Amino acid sequence: GAPICGESCFTGKCYTVQCSCSWPVCTRN
């Protein structure tokens, strides 16, 4: 799978740069 960004995105939004929400976690683009 895609690398984890160390951020959850239960709200559907990621704040980490170059990461996108693959609910419920952010993954590196």
Swiss-Prot record:
Signal peptide: none annotated. Keywords: Disulfide bond, Knottin, Plant defense. Pfam families: Cyclotide. This is a cyclic peptide. The keyword Lipoprotein does not apply. There is a cross-link at residues 1-29 (Cyclopeptide (Gly-Asn)). Probably participates in a plant defense mechanism. The presence of a 'disulfide through disulfide knot' structurally defines this protein as a knottin. This is Vodo peptide M. It comes from Viola odorata.
